[in-house]
A protein has these predicted regions:
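Solvent-exposed loop/turn segments at secondary-structure junctions
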Residues: 20-23, 40-43, 63, 75-76, ...
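Short helix-initiation/N-cap motifs at beta->coil->alpha
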Residues: 2, 55-66, 214-222
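A short, structured surface patch at a secondary-structure boundary
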Residues: 16-86
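Flexible loop/hinge segments that line or gate small-molecule binding clefts
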Residues: 92-138
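Bacterial Sec-exported substrate-binding components of ABC uptake systems
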Residues: 1-23, 125, 138-179, 298-304
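Structured C-terminal subdomain patch of bacterial secreted/periplasmic proteins
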Residues: 123-135, 234-304
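Alpha-helical, coiled-coil/dimerization segments enriched in small aliphatic residues
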Residues: 42-44, 54, 190-217
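Short helices/loops that flank or line small-molecule/ion binding pockets
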Residues: 65-73, 91, 220-229
């Protein structure tokens, strides 16, 4: 994110802050070079469970700066600015720099704030997997395993191409709402913005995001969401258990029982699908999420 970082040797005690950073390091086979991880919205990928068990979990939520330092890290890779950005309550990059600990922030999340309403930043163009490929490539170079990075990128590119090829072109594009979570049924809903990972998923499936805002995580009332009239509602499954509506079954129960939302065509047509919430962040999980949604929509005949 505009910061130059130089390495004279590969890190030996890396801390992965945020699920995406941790899972990329694990996919690169670097569990023996990791001192700890923190901030996991959902469970680790099943194929990484064994490797992940070898790495200390600091917390599934935001860690403290002291907890990170107690692991004596020689490198910190972060998935989100909220973990090491200028407004982070955990630590700022300069806090690590003062201690001569190099840091890396995911290029997918280098966002600008465009006003007080864009709490999590905004994007003026659609996110693509290219940012993720850059991250995998750069992390693999930092750890001197560039060949593993290229193999992983090739695998993701093949999956993306296969997914696009599996969805036939149609004149009628499905429109999607991606509901991450809400503090309560009466509170505004946190949604995936049109140019973030959710917008990418809609695009790769030949559709569009019904929420037309550049904000990364717009919080909207249900009146506005109902007015957007999506063809499909994608509800996030989260393992963090911060709010009751983190659970997909709680979201579905609300959508089908509330007098207003139950009248939405998407609800009446049973066009509610469940997706791993981490896929709504621009991460390696995004392609998994797109595959999840495609499978459910095909099973219901909503895409051929």
């Amino acid at each position: 994110c505009g910061v130059d970082v130089t390495f004279t040797k590969a890190p030996e005690r890396a801390v992965g802050l945020g699920q995406n950073s941790a899972e990329i390091l694990l996919l690169l086979g670097l569990e023996d070079k990791m001192a700890g991880t923190a901030f996991w919205p959902s469970k680790v990928l099943p194929e990484l469970a064994e490797a992940n068990a070898k790495v200390k979990l600091l917390t599934v939520e935001f860690p403290t700066f002291e907890a990170i330092l107690s692991e004596n890290p020689d490198f910190v890779a972060a998935a989100l600015p909220s973990l090491i950005g200028p407004d982070s309550k955990v630590a700022k990059r300069e806090d690590f720099t003062k201690l001569e600990i190099p840091t890396y922030l995911s290029p997918s999340t280098c966002l600008e704030k465009k006003g007080d309403t864009d709490l999590y930043g905004a994007r003026d163009k659609l996110w693509s997997m290219d940012s993720l490929y850059q991250e995998i490539d750069e992390l693999s170079q930092i750890f001197d395993v560039a060949d593993r990075g290229q193999a992983l990128i090739a695998d993701f590119k093949a999956r993306e191409a296969a997914l696009r090829a599996s969805v036939p072109a149609s004149d009628e594009k499905l429109s999607y709402v991606f509901w991450f979570s809400s503090q309560s049924p009466s509170a505004d809903a946190y949604l995936g913005g049109k140019n973030g990972a959710s917008g990418y998923i809609a695009d790769v499936l030949g559709g569009v995001n019904a929420i037309d805002t550049e904000a990364e995580w717009p919080a909207l009332g249900w009146e506005s969401i109902i007015a957007s009239n999506p063809s499909v509602i994608v509800v996030a499954s989260l393992d963090r258990n911060r709010w009751e509506l983190d659970k997909p079954e709680a979201k579905i129960a609300f959508l089908t029982s509330d007098p207003a939302t139950s009248q939405m065509p998407a609800v009446k047509n049973n066009a509610i699908v469940v997706m791993d919430g981490q896929a709504m962040n621009p991460t390696i999980r995004t392609i998994y999420g797109a595959e999840q949604v495609a499978e459910q929509l095909k099973a219901r005949g909503l895409i051929k």
